[in-house]
From Swiss-Prot:
Catalysed transformations (reactions): nicotinate beta-D-ribonucleotide + ATP + H(+) = deamido-NAD(+) + diphosphate
Example GO BP: NAD biosynthetic process
Claim: Transport is one of the keywords in the record: no
Functional description taken from the UniProt entry: Catalyzes the reversible adenylation of nicotinate mononucleotide (NaMN) to nicotinic acid adenine dinucleotide (NaAD).
Species the sequence originates in: Sulfurovum sp. (strain NBC37-1)
Record lineage: Bacteria, Pseudomonadati, Campylobacterota, Epsilonproteobacteria, Campylobacterales
Listed GO MF terms: ATP binding; nicotinate-nucleotide adenylyltransferase activity
Protein name: Probable nicotinate-nucleotide adenylyltransferase
Record pathway: Cofactor biosynthesis; NAD(+) biosynthesis; deamido-NAD(+) from nicotinate D-ribonucleotide: step 1/1
CDD domains given in the database record: NMNAT (cd02165)
Family the UniProt entry places it in: Belongs to the NadD family.
Key words, A-Z: ATP-binding, NAD, Nucleotide-binding, Nucleotidyltransferase, Pyridine nucleotide biosynthesis, Transferase
Length: 188
């Protein structure tokens, strides 16, 4: 009998507002070290923990398509954006479990302080392995997590810093002009 198991995937969700070279590093390293068939980059329609946005969901999705295009095993999915509302992580994991076996959820260490407040945290904690990306100033505290892996990334900037300081050094040339225009238009 042929094994009909589902492809194993990791989900890397986020605002990607804007996506930058650090996100590319995370994706490339995750594909290298995780035993997965596919990595799904999942831009959020609206992050329930954030209220300031540089770009609309469609623009952020477009940037993600451009930025992650050509990286083996990586797909950008518009599931959350198509919902036209904030989508909880557990809902997305359940959605993708219909087609795949969601094995990993990639998060920044800055999320750890609020992780237990996530909707259905216990369910998530029982069903996935957390892949924690190191972020400066945010210690990796794994108390309460059932299964986790650390993804060491030494990247000096965040999307928040890029938005606040208008610092485009860490924006890939594929999307730099568009991000610059969006920042300029937002100021006016």
């Amino acid at each position: 009998m042929v094994n009909q198991s589902k492809p194993e995937v990791a989900i890397f969700g986020g605002s990607f507002d804007p996506p930058h070279k650090g996100h590319q590093q995370i994706v490339r390293k995750a594909v290298q070290i995780l035993d997965i068939d596919k990595l799904i980059v999942l831009p959020a329609y609206l992050n329930p923990f954030k209220n300031v946005s540089l770009a609309n969901p469609e623009k952020r999705l477009e940037w993600c398509y451009q930025l992650f295009d050509g990286i083996p095993k990586v797909v950008v999915d518009d599931y959350e954006i198509r919902q036209n509302k904030s989508v909880r992580t557990s809902q997305s994991v359940k959605h993708f479990n219909n087609t795949y076996s969601v094995k990993y959820l990639i998060i920044g260490s800055d999320n750890l302080s609020t992780l237990t407040k996530w909707h259905e945290f216990k369910w998530l904690n029982d069903h996935i392995t957390w892949v924690i990306v190191t972020r400066k100033g945010h210690p990796v505290q794994t108390e309460g997590l059932k299964s986790w892996r650390i993804l060491e990334i030494d990247f000096p900037i965040s999307s928040t810093t890029i938005r606040e300081k208008k610092d485009l050094r860490y924006i890939d040339n594929k999307i730099k002009q568009s991000v610059e225009k969006t920042i300029k238009d937002k100021k006016e």
